[in-house]
A protein has these predicted regions:
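N-terminal alpha-helical transmembrane segments of multi-pass membrane transport
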Residues: 1-86, 96-103, 410, 440-441, ...
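Transmembrane helix-loop junctions in multi-pass membrane proteins
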Residues: 13, 44-48, 87-92, 101, ...
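Extracellular loop-to-transmembrane helix junctions
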Residues: 21-58, 97-134, 314-322, 362, ...
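Membrane-interface loop-to-helix entry segments
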Residues: 32-39, 43-56, 176-182, 189-238, ...
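Helix-loop-helix module between adjacent transmembrane segments
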Residues: 36-41, 110-135, 141-204, 367-377
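Extracellular/periplasmic helix-exit of transmembrane alpha-helices
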Residues: 41, 120-129, 232-248, 260-262, ...
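Flexible loop linkers connecting adjacent transmembrane helices
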Residues: 46-72, 94, 100-104, 116-149, ...
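Alpha-helical membrane segments and immediately flanking helix-loop junctions
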Residues: 66-98, 124-127, 133-142, 146, ...
Length: 491
């Protein structure tokens, strides 16, 4: 039995971490992310609107040209693996319970702003990436903080924070989601779940970044597409309810069905919960997807900016919306806004699908949660690997992190470590603040790269390499540091 003093001490730590996390995510970070979205939308003159065609077409040909490294599509898939996670099912359900259907509209608006932020951080990751001895690339917030702002120590702080949160704690959190889902659907014991989790994660994590990218390349898009097809089939077979669900989203966002007394409260609840879910689901500005973006091989930095912006669209406007429509279509028997949020959110989507298509769907939905959590482990660990490579290139460092992640996944499968999970939230929040400040300070580089791409757009490859980005482009504030891009002057 643990001493009372120890229990009291741990309780105090939990309380402090929970307070810091709530302050970060409820107000501070939320408004910073919104501000960043507005800032980059204005700074890039609405890149997500002006270049919708380029964003939509960014996936075409993105699987080519890695030269042994990570393709643009693989970097997109790794980012998608983290974006499209269990939060798209549980998190959206929680937003609907707390904010009602109106939360979805605000989620959409935040996603539209977030595409500009995602574009900017991915472009910066490409601009300031470095070439490794094996010919592959590494980039991300730690690198553009160091090489762009000239602050290597701050880059190291970001790397340490993200390494711990994504490389050690995230495997615990997602492994617990896997075993909980299997236990709820079929009564699988946590110990057997731990064996399964370790058996699935060890070969991929120990295989390094390329192995993780190859797995994510197929699993993440396939599971997202399978879920979208399932929900689309439900909507097509329930057209009346689907139309009512869409109507409830508009009315709920502006409180059109509420009396004057409940108007302000209803709109506020919808706005806050929709904004939070939109911000933290698509990860725009948090820094994680930029770690994947900087590892890709592309001919122009903006190409990776477009494809990561497309990831935000897929995550929020497609996958989150699918969940947000499926639940209201199931009816009031399933969705009861304001009721027992924590107890209901975990199973609300599964309950809605089962209500619409039958109880047989619970096992496929459990499998979906398992795969989403599994791909999130892979995606998050790849972020940690990039951060580790910034700190050290020693082989023992990579192997230690890989083994540690597998052990943490095993522990998380059988135990709920609330304090550790809250610590991860705090670390990720602090890392996001560092990243957002760096993004704003480096925004002129984003604008310069975008102007360079716009000037070169439409150039024929028959004219030579005129359409390929150069590190000393006239549109950049200054020539880029050496290490990744070629130069017109032959530096």
């Amino acid at each position: 039995m643990a001493p009372l003093g120890r229990i009291s001490w741990m309780g105090q730590v939990d309380a402090v971490l929970a307070s810091v996390s709530d302050m970060l995510y409820s107000w501070g970070l939320m408004w910073l992310l919104i501000g960043a979205g507005v800032f980059f939308t204005v700074r890039t003159r609405g890149v997500q609107v002006r270049h919708t065609d380029a964003i939509a077409a960014s996936v075409v040909g993105s699987r080519d040209g890695s030269h042994g490294g990570i393709t643009s599509f693989q970097a997109f898939a790794v980012g998608l693996a983290c974006r499209v996670g269990t939060g798209n099912i549980v998190g959206v359900a929680l937003a609907l319970i707390l904010g009602g259907p109106g939360a979805v509209l605000w989620m959409w608006l935040v996603a539209i702003l977030g595409t500009a932020t995602a574009f900017s951080e991915a472009t910066l990751a490409q601009l300031f990436k470095v070439r490794r001895p094996d010919g592959t690339f590494r980039g991300g917030p730690a690198y553009y903080i160091s090489r762009g702002l000239g602050l290597p120590i701050l880059g190291g702080v970001f790397a340490v924070v993200f390494l711990i949160a994504n490389g050690l704690v995230m495997p615990m959190v997602q492994a617990n989601a896997i075993t909980a889902s299997l236990q709820g659907a079929g009564g699988l014991s946590p110990s057997l779940g731990a064996v399964l989790v370790v058996a699935l994660t060890a070969p991929v994590l120990l295989g390094g970044l390329r192995a993780m990218a190859r797995v994510a390349e197929y699993l993440a898009p396939f599971m997202a597409l399978a879920y979208l097809v399932l929900v689309l089939a439900i909507l097509l077979t329930h057209p009346v309810q689907a139309l009512e669900a869409l109507t409830s989203i508009i009315e709920g966002a502006f409180g059109l069905r509420q009396g004057l007394g409940g108007l302000a409260g209803g709109v506020t609840a919808a706005l806050l919960n929709g904004v939070r879910r939109g911000l933290f689901s698509n990860e725009a500005g948090l820094g994680g997807a930029a770690c994947a973006a900087g590892s890709a091989t592309v001919s122009h930095p903006v190409q990776q900016g477009f494809i990561q912006a497309f990831g935000v669209v897929v995550d929020t406007l497609f996958v989150c919306t699918a969940t947000a429509l499926a639940i209201p279509v199931a009816g009031a028997d399933v969705l009861q806004p304001g009721a027992s949020a924590k107890e209901s959110a975990g199973t609300l989507t599964q309950d809605a699908i089962a209500h619409l298509v039958g109880e047989w769907s619970r096992w496929p939905m459990a499998l979906l949660v398992v795969v989403l959590a599994y791909t999130t482990i892979i995606g998050a660990f790849s972020y940690a690997q990039v951060c580790l490579d910034y700190l050290t290139d020693r082989p023992w460092g990579a192997r230690t992190l890989q083994i540690g992640a597998v052990i943490c996944a095993g522990i998380g499968s059988v135990q709920q470590l609330t304090t550790v999970w809250t610590l991860a939230d705090v670390l990720l929040g602090l890392g996001a603040i560092i990243n957002l400040v760096a993004l704003v300070l480096l925004s002129r580089w984003v604008v310069g790269a975008l102007r360079d791409w716009e000037a070169r757009r439409g150039m024929s490859t028959a004219k030579g390499d005129q359409s390929v980005f150069r590190g000393d482009s006239e549109y950049l504030p200054a020539p880029l540091p050496e290490g990744a891009w070629e130069y017109s002057t032959g530096r």
